[in-house]
Every structure is written in C-alpha cells, then in structure tokens.
Amino acid sequence: MTAVPAHDHHTLQDFIERHQRLFVLTGAGCSTDSGIPDYRDLQGGWKRPQPVTFQAFMGELSTRQRYWARSLVGWPRFGLAQPNATHHALAALEARGQLEVLLTQNVDRLHQAAGSQAVIDLHGRLDVVRCMGCERRMPRTEFQVLLEQANPGWAALEAAQAPDGDADLDDVAFEHFVVPPCPVCGGVLKPNVVFFGENVPRARVERAFAHLQAADAVLVVGSSLMVYSGFRFVQTAARNGLPIAALNFGRTRADELLTLKVEQSCAQALAFLHAPPHLPRARSVNDASARSA
C-alpha cells in the first residue's frame, strides 16, 4: 500500500463510516490531552531518556530505587488523570457497533474510564502492582501508601510529569530510597506493565490477533508504532490486505503500509463520532464552492 497524504478529517470520517469491524490501535497521543506526556517527537525519536528495561529493573536495586522514587512523586497526578475527548470518541465508536476491538499500548486505563468495554491492554496496566515472586497483585494506590510510609518527605517533592506515571526528578540521590518488598513473600514488586525487554503475555497477543482476523479495517490513533509489539499488528493487517488508516502527528513506522494518514488533533478529527451515525455531513464553504463551480 502507498501512504495517502490527507489533511481533511472528513476523509477519515468516510474511512470509518465505510467499515463496521474496526480494529483500533491506540498510543500515547490519545492521552496527552489528559495531561500525560507522550514519548516521541514528530520524527519518532525519543523526547527523553529511554524507559527502564525489564532486565535492569529486575537485576539492579539502584534501578528499582530510581524507578519507584520517580513513581512515588508522579503517581498522584497520573492516578487522577481523566479521559479526554479522544477517549470518549472511541467509546462512542464502540456504542455505534463499529468496533471489533480496541487494542491500546497505553497503561492508563483511560479508555475504560471513558466507557470502552472491548479493550485489550497490550502493555498491561499501571494501576496494579505485581509480585514477581508469589504473583500477588495489589492496587497501585495501596502500594503508594507503603512507599510514602517508608520514605517520609518524598511525596512533597515537586517535579514535571513524565509519561510512565512518574516524575522527572533531577539532581536527586536515590541510594537511600526504600523500596518495600512484597508483604507476603518478600519478593520484588513491579508495576503490572510490560517493560522494554519484556515479552507481552502470549495469550494476550493471540487474543489480539484473533480480533484482527475478524476485522475489516485498522485504525491507528495517536501512535508512531515505533515499538514492534504494536507495529506487528499493522504489519500483519497490511499483509492480509486490510485497509489501514492512521491519525497521528509526525512519522509512523508504518507510513509505507497506510491506506490513509491524517495529521490532525485526535480529538478534532474524531469529534464526528459524538453525533448520531449516518447523518449527512454539514456542508463546508469549500463544498459549496465546488458544487457551484
């Protein structure tokens, strides 16, 4: 397929209204209007140092100290984030009966908060903490209490919000930060998300591919697709001949595979989903001029 440059959200509206079983794949660009920063620039490069790897988190106490210190400071704001117009528009798409599944690379659960039900959290969820020893789960809010009790004064630190529910703590020493162990077995506690270098659970991937098999088109919203765990679904869709549209500012890894690309605000481009389906579109000045020419 060849990427089609498009700047008019009506083209995207036509694409969506032509399909009834959309496989929607979302990324960080969906949540920026909720106050959660994204990761990449318009060229798909990193805006900040790369996220922690699974191997470093599990193998180095210093990495866990730094991760959980930043998370202690950033979690309260992240946990209070609310769904924005993009999340609500995609929930409306499901209510119209046009959604096969919504596969999100985000870990913020804002799609569910907006009312979406057919959601697969590809990379897990940040509001749950998992013991890597006994597999016990606990709410992130519960672990926040343990972190603050073990590290008095840290919650009062001020820092800019970062993408992973953490905060940009500069010039802070972490060597005395206390990371609470699992209260049951004493094991290492980790957010229940897929880190870089960690595999997405196979059953989750297979479930997503089953939905892709049943879909009649793919819609990418707010993702550069630079991470292979998300890109592979678009790659497979292209191989199977499915039409693919992307709504994203800047370059995506799949540009050469796209049927349609729209570089606009996600919320603005999807605003039509809040209206009842199949209503005639309002005529623009350009439409009227074209008809009278």
Swiss-Prot record:
Cofactor: Zn(2+)
EC numbers for this chain: 2.3.1.286
Positions with a binding annotation for NAD(+): 27-47, 105-108, 222-224, 248-250, 266
An MF annotation (GO) of this entry: NAD+ binding
Active site, per annotation: H123
Cofactor note: Binds 1 zinc ion per subunit.
Gene Ontology cellular-component terms listed: cytoplasm
UniProt function note: NAD-dependent protein deacetylase which modulates the activities of several enzymes which are inactive in their acetylated form.
Name of the molecule in the record: NAD-dependent protein deacetylase
Organism per entry: Xanthomonas axonopodis pv. citri (strain 306)
Gene: cobB
